Structure formats: C-alpha cells, structure tokens
Curated annotation (Swiss-Prot):
Transmembrane segments: none annotated. Could be responsible for synthesis of pseudouridine from uracil-55 in the psi GC loop of transfer RNAs. It catalyses: uridine(55) in tRNA = pseudouridine(55) in tRNA. One of its GO terms (molecular function) is tRNA pseudouridine(55) synthase activity. Its EC number is 5.4.99.25. Keywords: Isomerase, tRNA processing. This is Probable tRNA pseudouridine synthase B. InterPro entries: Dyskerin-like, PsdUridine_synth_cat_dom_sf, PsdUridine_synth_N, PUA, PUA-like_sf, PUA_sf, tRNA_PsdUridine_synth_B_fam, TruB_arch. GO terms for biological process: box H/ACA sno(s)RNA 3'-end processing; mRNA pseudouridine synthesis; rRNA pseudouridine synthesis; snRNA pseudouridine synthesis; tRNA pseudouridine synthesis. Belongs to the pseudouridine synthase TruB family. Type 2 subfamily.
Length: 334
C-alpha cells in the first residue's frame, strides 16, 4: 500500500488480524439469525439505515420522519448534521438504536467548499492546508449545542479536489466532534485573508459511505410501500443494513454458542467463552462481542489485552455495557 493511501485512512479502515483461541468450536445452525438472513421484521428491528440526509431539516426531524415512514417506535442517528448540511447520516432502528455509540471512534469524512475572502496563490493554499493535518485545537462554534470549551481533535487527512479562484473544494477525514466550519475559519486566518464555509456534505461516517447502501427518504417511502402493499421485501432489505454493519470497524471477540445466552442476560464475558479475537485489543477499548455466525451480541470495555485473552484460561475479558442479542435466540447452556 502506498504511503499516500495509508495517510488517507480513517480509523474505520484499519484491517485487523484474527487470533484463534479454540480451533474446535462450532456453531449450531438452529440457533440465532445470521445478519443477512433474518426475517424482514427482525431485519428492521435490528437494522441501520445509511441515509442521504437532504439539506434543510434537522437530523432530529429526519429521524422523526423515518419513524413515521416505517411505523417505528424508536430510532437514533449517529452524529448530528446541521440543517444545511447533506450526506451520510446513519440511523439505527428499534432494538439497534444504541448501536450508534459504536460509530464515535470510527471517524468521519466530509467534502467542503471553502470561500476565501481574498486572493491567495494556489501553492500557498496547498502548503497551509497540509499543516492542518494531525492534532488541532478547536472551540465549538457559537451556534453549537455543546459547551464552548477548547478541545483537541484529529484531522486524519485533507485532500484538495479543486481550486477555482477564491473557492477551494476539499475532502477531509476527521475525528468525531470536529467542526469543519471552525476548521475553515482557522485555515482562512492562517492564509491571512479569512474564509467561510460555503457548502458541506458528509461522505462517510465510519463504515457508512456514499455507496450502493445509501438511500433517500423518498426511497424508504417507496420500499416500505412495496413491502406492505405488494409483499416485495427485497428493496427494503437492501435499504436497511443489519446492525452489525455499524460495528464493522470495532475490534471483535467471537464467542462460543454456550456463552451467548449468558452475555445476552447481561453477564460479563469470561475467557473460557472466547473462540477467536482481533489482534491489538488494549485494556479500555470498546469491543464488539460476536457469535460465530457474526451476529452482534453486545458492546463492552476490554478488561484484558488480546495477548492476555490468548494466554489466560480464566478471568473477565470484557465488561459488558450494552446488550443487543435477544435472550431467547440462543438457549441457556449454563
């Protein structure tokens, strides 16, 4: 992989090797539901939509519309977009609502149009913008809903797409909670002419991208109608991703069938239940606990490193924080 490609990665792009702890473990096909094989009702209940938010409404309004369109009681979005901003807005449905927490460490990508308030040579624009890659200090904008404390955020990459006079179109990958409006303001100050954000679109939120999974509100209306009125579920099934999509980027631990029900009932994960795990897990990391069918069981905080989980035969490996697996999908085997 070229250096430039490595540099243009979000945390969600990290490829993780797998360590096998128990080579003989198998899963019973009678139990559970592989993510892409759930009945459509369960697919919705445990689903996430990669929504293309239109400019205009608030993120909260868009979620309320989705609840009405799909006749849902609960839904939640992963990372607020300002009303004028369009693009990728992951919306988790019903039983999957709390999975949006998993998107926080994943990073986000935007395409922004910056308008400079004076003329600047292209080479200076390129050089100055490159300096904003890495750690930056920001204070949330006045219009922000959070307290205006100074905080550090990471800019993973900035890629200039086009410069047309005083207009600069660029792509930027950032840590969650980074304000692009503030970033542009500070780039303008560094260039000595000032600048403002003319337009903004989010193109990625962790594993959710501008790809074939991206759907509009109009799409959802049509697809729900096809299912309810005509019994055609394939379009709605394509528009709603399994909740497991939202944890693609997290370090994972796969567990035995015999351990699933215990974790689903809220028990912490102990070492004897582990079949395999990702390399590089550190104490305190947010991890996803998975079945051998790649179903999400729970999210939790690692209490051991990958190495410790491999070497030890007992002890608590993960402090379970959020359970997603229903208690009755796997039998009690303890």
């Amino acid at each position: 992989m070229a250096r430039d490609e490595v540099r243009r990665m979000l945390p969600a792009d990290i490829k993780r090797e797998v360590l096998i702890k128990d080579e003989n473990a198998e899963t019973n096909p009678k139990w559970g539901f592989p993510p892409y094989e759930r009945p459509i009702e369960l697919h919705i209940q445990y689903g996430v939509i990669n929504l293309d938010k239109p400019p205009g409404p608030t993120s909260h309004e868009v979620v309320a519309w989705i609840k009405r369109i799909l006749n849902l009681e609960k839904a939640g979005h992963g990372g607020t977009l300002d009303p004028k901003v369009s693009g990728v807005l992951p919306v988790a449905l019903e039983k999957a609502t709390r999975v949006v927490q998993a998107l926080l460490p994943a990073g986000k990508e935007y395409v922004a149009l910056m308008h400079l308030h004076g003329d600047v040579p292209e080479n200076k624009i390129i050089d100055v913008m490159k300096e904003f890659e890495g750690e930056i200090i920001q204070r949330p904008p006045l219009r922000s809903a959070v307290k205006r404390r100074l905080r550090t955020r990471k800019v993973y990459y900035i890629e200039i797409l086009e410069i047309d006079g005083r207009d600069v179109l660029f792509k930027v990958g950032v840590e969650a909670g980074t304000y692009i409006r503030s970033l542009i303001h500070h780039i303008g100050l560094a260039l000595g002419v000032g600048a403002h954000m003319a337009e903004l679109r989010r193109t990625r939120s962790g594993p959710f991208k501008e790809d074939e999974t991206l759907v509009t509100l109009h799409d959802l209306v049509d697809y729900y109608h096809f299912w309810k009125e005509d019994g055609i579920e394939k379009y709605l099934r394509r528009a709603i991703q399994p909740m497991e999509k939202a944890v693609e980027h997290l370090p994972k631990i796969w567990i035995k069938d015999s351990a699933v029900a215990a974790v689903a009932h809220g028990a912490n994960l102990t070492v004897p239940g582990i079949v395999k795990l990702n390399v590089g897990i550190k104490r305190g990391d947010l991890v996803a606990i998975m079945t051998l069918k790649d179903e999400l069981v729970a999210l939790g905080k690692a209490m051991m490193t990958s190495q410790e989980m491999m070497q030890r035969s007992k002890g608590i490996a993960v402090d379970v924080e959020k359970v997603f697996m229903p208690r009755d999908w796997y039998p009690k085997l303890w």
